[in-house]
UniProtKB/Swiss-Prot annotation:
It comes from Lactococcus lactis subsp. lactis (strain IL1403). This is Phenylalanine--tRNA ligase alpha subunit. Belongs to the class-II aminoacyl-tRNA synthetase family. Phe-tRNA synthetase alpha subunit type 1 subfamily. Keywords: Aminoacyl-tRNA synthetase, ATP-binding, Cytoplasm, Ligase, Magnesium, Metal-binding, Nucleotide-binding, Protein biosynthesis. Its cofactor is Mg(2+). CDD domains: PheRS_alpha_core. One of its GO terms (biological process) is phenylalanyl-tRNA aminoacylation. PROSITE patterns: AA_TRNA_LIGASE_II. Tetramer of two alpha and two beta subunits.
């Protein structure tokens, strides 16, 4: 059998075997056996060394035609096998689209977010604007502009996270008082704003303290603002948050940036003022600090304190949420325990 006959015989056997191949592994093995480096065609073509110059091109062309034909049929067979595998998988893994799907668990806003939104809604209804501030603040705005110069003894009241000697994590949202007054055009009217945000203190975390918590600063500055305006504002806000039958008690206090300063207590919502474990049997619960803006704070913003006056207050979101919902450990707000948070989902 000459080379031409051997190639034709190999061609017929290869194409016949190709028709019966049913999987990709067998298909690849067939290509290796017939056309690989050690395959049958390679062995046949080793005999070309004995051919004449006229015979070699004929045999070479015949071998190339066989390779091209096999390559085309190989690719077609490969597609056929892949399609068969896919069809078999579809038949064995049929999806019943009428079956109910997996229900997605409903999420909700965090309880502190809800509390902040409720407070913001109350103040927006009273004509206040909401402003954002810097969590990384300067010593100048955090302390000095709040009537706390570098040698002021009241600085010992707060432990501070300092980044540099002049840059720190703000210890309260009060710096927004100065920043907002600096930017406000009082020739167009007074200022009414609240500034919610995170603040930081070097506290040891426990059931009632956290190194990070939330405050909402409130500020009103205009002509003829009095303590009566502060009292009326806070009375309205607290009754909206805790119920219309709540009463407020005002106690003298001290804050460097307000004068006079007060601590505001709310009548206990559990016992109605009779005394219980929530109010420590006093009938009252401390809720916030407030006061009239100190003349020095006004003057440092370029305002004439004999013409302008104002009041300021600070609300703690965590404290309000803890009192409203009977939560006794502040750490629950930050630990991300869904079992705790979903109780207050809305």
């Amino acid at each position: 059998m000459n080379l031409q006959e051997k190639i034709e015989d190999l061609r017929k056997r290869t194409l016949s075997d190709l028709l019966s191949v049913a999987d990709e592994k067998t298909l690849n093995n067939l290509r290796t056996v017939m056309l690989g480096k050690k395959g049958e065609l390679t062995e046949i073509l080793k005999g070309m060394k004995d051919l004449t110059n006229e015979e070699r091109p004929v045999i070479g062309a015949l071998a190339n035609a066989f390779r091209d034909e096999f390559g085309a049929k190989f690719e077609a067979k490969k597609v056929e096998i892949e399609q068969a595998v896919m069809n078999a998988a579809l038949e064995s893994e049929t999806l019943d689209v009428t079956l109910p799907g997996k229900a997605q668990k409903k999420g909700s806003r965090h309880i502190l977010t809800q509390t902040q939104e409720e407070i913001e809604e109350i103040f927006l209804g009273m004509g206040y604007e909401i402003v954002d501030g810097y969590e990384v603040e300067t010593d100048h705005y955090n302390f000095e502009r709040m009537n706390l110069p570098k040698d002021h003894p009241a600085r010992d009241m707060q432990d501070t996270f300092y980044i540099t000697n002049e840059v720190l994590l703000r210890t309260h949202t009060s710096p927004m008082q100065a920043r907002t007054m600096d930017a406000h055009d009082f020739s167009k009217g007074g200022l009414r704003m609240i500034a919610p945000g995170r603040v930081y203190r070097r506290d040891t975390d426990d059931a009632t303290h956290s190194h990070q918590f939330h405050q909402i600063e409130g500020l009103v500055v205009d002509k003829n603002i009095t303590m009566a305006d502060l009292k009326g504002t806070l009375d309205l806000v607290m009754k909206k948050m805790f119920g219309q039958d709540r009463e407020l008690r005002w106690r003298p206090s001290y804050f460097p940036f307000t004068e006079p300063s007060v601590e505001v207590d709310i009548s206990c919502f559990k016992c109605g003022g009779k005394g219980c474990n929530v109010c420590k049997h006093t009938g009252w619960i401390e809720i916030l600090g407030a006061g009239m803006v100190h003349p020095n704070v006004l003057e440092m913003s370029g305002l004439d304190s004999s013409v302008y006056s104002g009041f300021a207050f600070g609300l703690g979101q965590e404290r309000i949420a803890m009192l409203r919902y009977g939560i006794n450990d502040i750490r629950g707000f930050y630990q991300g325990d869904v079992r705790f948070l979903e109780q207050f989902g809305k």
